[in-house]
Each structure stands twice: as structure tokens, then as C-alpha cells.
């Protein structure tokens, strides 16, 4: 647990800390800073650059150099409980490891922990052998051990090393081991008791700093990991030995000298015994090609519960050097010391159960590994032992078999290997133990690894050579994959394959991949079986973990290098090449399609211009144009089409005279409505062939003369309508109802709503009536695209004006810019104030426009009307359609639906000016010609509609497009006339 480094609270907390520090300064010489820093395992900054962090078994202590011996601490559960309370109090005061008060309190608590005496040297004779005469322990052995119990224990107690590969694994019990045995025997002999809740320490206090020192339990991983790889301990086993179950309440561990603060700290007391036992068991190399021989139960039906070595290989001692047997009368010093310690508890060897004998044998295998320290050089030897253990963990040479586990007496064996092992065990037991001399300093020898790196190894040890081992892996979509998620995934996988979670070892994460190995299990499942089963239950694993499993399989790893996975389904190089070629072909095809589309569009524009050039009949260019202009001059005195006096023509205007051949009285008040037409052919018009040809010739000359067209457009831009005030639209309450501030309705020509029916209690809407020839009945209503807060006003205008046709000339969104808000429901019905709009149908007529049908209902009066919307899609905001044909077909479709109606047509785009004015101009001119009006002054018609709404037809291109569309329609009418 890391103490937070936050400052102490204000007020009395800081003053109390200063007062306590002053009291401590007076009671301890040197002040607070004289205390050696504790907690360097939790905070690396405590030690200076001249100090190293020494592993004291608890918090770590800063020390200059590593040559001093550290005493062994006897840490029990009450000690841990007290330290836990002290840490809580310090943390509640806002203290951190850097505070002097924290260091002083921790130092005082550390001094209260009992120490173990360092091992004393044995009296030795000149020959270096243990005196033949047994000491007091031998007398106790003769007094308290029956003759029949000694052989039984001899099979369980560790023997002297046969091959010399591991010094100390079978050494006689030293005084230090006798010191360590009493607490261990308490775990062994006393019945297990449930821990008291008050005495159980919280794992969260020490959890971030307590992890395995050497990475894995089976010894396949070295102390160095590849970059990006984080290892976790194997999952807890289903059953643990009896003495391990109480390791959390009582623990013995030595404060052996450690490494600098950069190295990982040591394990907690509860984990030390379990990790040490598993480390001993992991020293047996697991050769995949050899068969595993599980241990057989002891005679009498009792099995070794919690035996961690069950399922491991039993390897013979072939190839080991046999020592000559010693005299049989030499007593076993190990038996003497064990009997002496047991006698102190009033227990004799024959009273121990087989399970206790097995556990005691395992304990004695563990103790020599920590007792190879001499009093004078404890620190250096401890570091060497750590280095030796790490090298042993990194990999065993398969050619050098490890020492076997002590077998049970009377266990039936069915192979010559186990018989030979028992023979050599008995031979080693009768050999007189040699006196343990001072351990020599290990010599480091450079050896070449398969990867070409020099690695130090211990002189006198067999050279290690890592072998390629297979690892199972599960690749997920989470990068990097957290350790908790990986462990959770393996736990769920263990449930699905009916395995114990402890069967998974060497758990690591490499980016998004989880790697693991499998112990020998009851189901005899291999790595391939487990990974295959993981693929079968992939959906269940993903559902329970929230991860997406991308791949499972088996791979290999060498000397902490990154795992090289072998995918289950590898992609052939030819397939990759084909996929690349297909992708390139797709990109090339897309580019070609875009190029073709651009060419087609450009060709369509050019074709339209060429078609306009060929509209008129041959030989009728100059003469017909002159005759048509002369006819127009003859009717200058007639009544104007727009019921207003015509002024003198402007000098800059070309052919601005407006005339008509027919009498003005022919137009009735109800004849303003459009004449129906067909999409295939134009309507039959009251136009003779000669008049039509003259109109075409005039239009052709008008379009070919670019200077005349430019001057005409300049004159239109300079035209100002009278009156032209827009005060109502610019009012404070109405300005937010305008989509564009430059296109507002005139005060004298605007649609007025009924105030009593309006949700905003206002009669304003940005809409203008467009009158063709009858002021009492407008032919069009030009309006802007509704805003989100003016949709109800829009439907009120539709209802009050009696409109049944809506012409929409803009998409809702163009180039990421909203052009118009959706004022109709996507499906079903929507209520806008008191008007319920129900979408009946939506028919895509072609790629350029679609048609929608609505029911419009007034929920107050329960009256219902039908309504049709024509939506043109291919008209850009600032431009013109690519061709006039789609718009002319669209207009014919609108007029066919509008046949016989006497209500205005609502026309809108985004701003209600550019595209709206162009469509109204084209439709108005063509409707006049269809009714027999023999005049074709499009400029004068545009001035007429601009008198009623400003900004109609915003650009010269739109004006030229209107001229072209009129010429196209006239040409189509002439072709439809009988010759």
C-alpha cells in the first residue's frame, strides 16, 4: 500500500505533526532525518543515488552498499495487524513515506518485531566431518523415536545431494533451520482455525507490491521478460496443502538482502511458502516427449491431499554419479535435529500421520534454500542465491536430470526408473553427511545464448539451454489487454473446459494477446485441445467477458522473446496478391467511373448548346428575326400585358418592347391556371408554325449574341421595384423567421396569415404572392424553405391559401449545409400546431425528382384535404441543372397534376429567390405561349415578377438557363404540331 503524498489537513493536523516531530527530535539524537528510510519498495525516490533498497521482508529499507548482513524478522499475523493499523493512522493524517514522522514511527515499529539469531558455525574437526559422537539431539532421538519410525521418516526427509548439482538440497539440518522449524511445525501440528475477521489483513494494502519474484512457477520463464510482456502468477489451485492454508495468519520469512528499488519486491508471508514449494517443484524439467507418472496413493488408502507435485514427471537418476556407501552405524543428523525439535513439542515421530510426514518432508526441502548464508557474508551469498535461482528458473538442460522428489515408503513402482531412484536414495541416506564449509563465492561464466547474447551462468552448474516450448494464445480486440481481463477470460475458459483454474500457468499478455501454458490435468487436455475448445465457445466467452476474440492457436517462445503465433488458418501468399489486385482494380474502376461521369456531364452541356444553335429552320435566321421584331413594333400601342403603362425603352435594353398579337380580353379571370401537359410530349399550344419559327429564330439570335445578353442582364440588375419597403419583415419579432436577410417580402406584396390561428400570434411569413395577370388570384406563392420554428406557419399558409401543389427545388442538405428543414413526417403522421400531416405515399419518379402525397387535416375543424409535393433534387444552390430536359419533364408532371385548379402553386427553394424565380419565370412564359399570347419578352416578364418579390433569378447563368429552357420547349411544341 502506498501512502498518499497529499499534504496534511489545515489547522490542528499540521500543528500536531510539528509538535510530534519536535518531541521525537528531543527524544532521539540526530533528529528525524537520522532514521534510515523505510518504504523504498513503495516509493523509489526515498533512496539516494548512493543507496540501494534492501528487501527487509516488509517495506524495504535504504542502505549504503550491500555488504552488511541483515537480521531475519519473525513476522506474525499480530505484527501485520499492528502495522496495518499504524499505516491507516498515518494515512489518515495525510502523511507520506517522505515525512520524517512516518519514517520514525515505522522505524519504531520495525524495532519491535522479533529477530531470529543468525546461524552459528558448527564445531568441526580437521577432517571437515561432523563428529561421529551424537550430541543431545542424538540422545533425544534415541529416547523418543522408536526403531520402526526412523526408516519411515528417512524416506520422507531430504537426502544429501547425489550429483552435487544443488548444494544444500540435502544438507543436514543447521541451527538456523532448527530456529525456523518451530513456527513451521506450529502450522503442521496445530489444527487449522478459521481466521478471526479482526486479524485478517486487507490484501489491498499490500497487493500492488506483492507479486512473484521470478515470474512463473514452472521455471520456463526467466527473470527478464520481453518488452511489452507482463506476467502474472498462475491461477490459484483448487486445493492447497494443510500447512499452506494457515500461512496467511502466521508466516516466517527472512529479510534476505535484495536488490535495488528497481527490482520487484518480495512476496508476502502467506505467499512465501506456497511460492517456495512450487519453485522447488518447478525445478523438475517438464519434457513434453516423456510420459507423466502421477504419484500413487500411500498404503492404507490415505492420499496426499494438496500435494503440489502431483501430476509432475518422475524422472530417474540415470547418469548420476553414485557415491560409495558410508558405514551404516553413522546416525542421520537430520533425523536427530527433527526429533529434537519435535520432542520440544511433546510429539514423537511415530505419532505423525502420513500427511504430516509428507508436509514435513516438503518443509525440509524448502529450508536449506534459505539457509545457505554464512554469518559474515549473508548479503552477498543471498544475492548469489537469488541469481542462481533465477538462472535455474530460466531453463534446465534436458541432458542433466534434476534431483528427484523423495518418494513415499512402500509406494508400488512399476518401472525400473523408480526402482533405481529408490536404490540411490537409500545409498545417499547411508552416506555420512559432510560438514558444511564456508560457501565459496560463485564465479560467473559468460555463455553464448542461441540469440547471440552473452549470459552469465554459475560455475559448477550445468549449462542451461532454453528449449522451444509451446504456448497457447488468445488474441482479443482490446489493445493492450489488461491483466485482470486476461485472468477473467481464463477463469471462464476453465469453467467451459471443466478444468481447474490452477491448470493454467505462465499467464502473460502481449499487447492484445493472452498467452498461457497448461499443467498436466485430469482430463489430459493439451494446449491444442484448450485453444480449440476456446474457439468453439468463442461466443460464450465474448458474451461473459465483453471482449471480442479474434484468433486462438498455439505458438512458440524462446528466451523471453516475443511469442511468434502460428495462426490456425494462414493466408496463402497467392490469396494476398489476389486481394491486393482486386483492391487496386476497384480503385482504378472508381477513378474511371468518375472520369466518365465528368466527361458525360461536360458532353451534355456541349450538346445542349449545339442543340440550341440548331433550333431554327434553315434560311430563316436574318429574315425571320427581322419580321418578328417588325410585328412586335406594330403592336406597341396595344394594352400592356401587365396592365401598366409602358415607358420608353432604355437605350441599353435590347428588344425590351412587350407586345401581344391576341386581344387582351381573351384572358378570363379563371384562365391563369396551367394547362396540363405530358412528360413525353409538350402540350398542344395555340401557336402556328410561322409564329413558332420566328420565336425560335429570335431566341437563337438572342442567345448567340453574348454581348446583348450581358447588357440585358446588367439592365435587369439595375432595375429597382417601386415600392420596395420591407419594414414588416425586418421587425424585431419577425427577423428570426427569415432564413436569409437579403431576400425578404415587400410590405405591399406578402402573404398575411390569420393572427387568431397562428401559434406565434403574428401574421408574418416570408412568402410573396406572384400575380400573372389577375390581381385577385395569384398564380404562385414564392417562399423560402421552412425553418424548424416556422413549419406550423408554413402549413397554416398552405391551408389558408387552399394550395394543393407544392414545388420544392432544393435538397434538404447540400455540401453539409442545411438548405431546408424537413416539414413533413418520414412516415405516418405528425402534428404541426393544429394541422396534422399524414404521409400517404412517396414515389421516386426518376433520379431527378420524386413525388409525395399527403393528407392535410385541421384538427379544429376536422376538415381534410389532399396535397401533392413535387421535389426536384438535381438543382445545385448557386448553379443550374446539367440539362434542361429533366426540369422540363418535371414541369410537365407538375402541370398535369395541376390541371383545372384555381389555387396558387407554392414554389420554394432555400432562400425563395434564385431557383424559385427561375422556375416561375420559365413556367409563366411557357404558359403564356400555350394560351396563344404571341410575345416572348423574357426580360420584361422577369421585371414583372421582381416587382412582387426581390431577388428572383439571382445569377446570369440562371437567366440564360431560363432562355434555353423556353427555346427547348418551343422547339418541342413545333415538332408536335401537324406539318
From Swiss-Prot:
Highest taxon above the source species: Eukaryota
Region (Sufficient for dimerization of proICA512): 449-575, 601-732
Distribution of this protein across tissues and organs: Detected in pituitary (at protein level).
Lumenal side, ranges: 35-575
Comp. bias (Pro residues): 400-409
Topology of the protein relative to the lipid bilayer: Single-pass type I membrane protein
Glycosylated residues (UniProt): 506, 524
UniProt site (Cleavage): 448-449
Membrane side Cytoplasmic: residue ranges: 601-979
Keywords: Cell membrane, Cell projection, Cytoplasmic vesicle, Disulfide bond, Endosome, Glycoprotein, Isopeptide bond, Membrane, Nucleus, Phosphoprotein, Receptor, Signal, Synapse, Transcription, Transcription regulation, Transmembrane, Transmembrane helix, Ubl conjugation
Region (RESP18 homology domain): 35-131
Subcellular localization: Membrane; Cytoplasmic vesicle, Secretory vesicle membrane; Perikaryon; Cell projection, Axon
A GO molecular-function annotation: ubiquitin-like protein ligase binding
Segments crossing the lipid bilayer: 576-600
Region (Disordered): 113-171, 248-272, 285-332, 391-466, 643-680
Cross-linked residues, Glycyl lysine isopeptide (Lys-Gly) (interchain with G-Cter in SUMO): 754
Compositional bias annotation for Polar residues: 451-466
Biased composition (Low complexity): 652-677
Stated family: Belongs to the protein-tyrosine phosphatase family. Receptor class 8 subfamily.
Subunit structure, interactors included: Homodimer; shown for the unprocessed protein (proICA512) in the endoplasmic reticulum and resolved during protein maturation as ICA512-TMF seems to be predominantly monomeric in secretory granules; however, ICA512-CCF interacts with ICA512-TMF disrupting the ICA512-TMF:SNTB2 complex. The isolated lumenal RESP18 homology domain has been shown to form disulfide-linked homooligomers. Interacts (via cytoplasmic domain) with phosphorylated SNTB2; this protects PTPRN against cleavage by CAPN1 to produce ICA512-CCF.
Described function: Plays a role in vesicle-mediated secretory processes. Required for normal accumulation of secretory vesicles in hippocampus, pituitary and pancreatic islets. Required for the accumulation of normal levels of insulin-containing vesicles and preventing their degradation. Plays a role in insulin secretion in response to glucose stimuli. Required for normal accumulation of the neurotransmitters norepinephrine, dopamine and serotonin in the brain.
Name of the protein described by the UniProt record: Receptor-type tyrosine-protein phosphatase-like N
Originating organism: Bos taurus
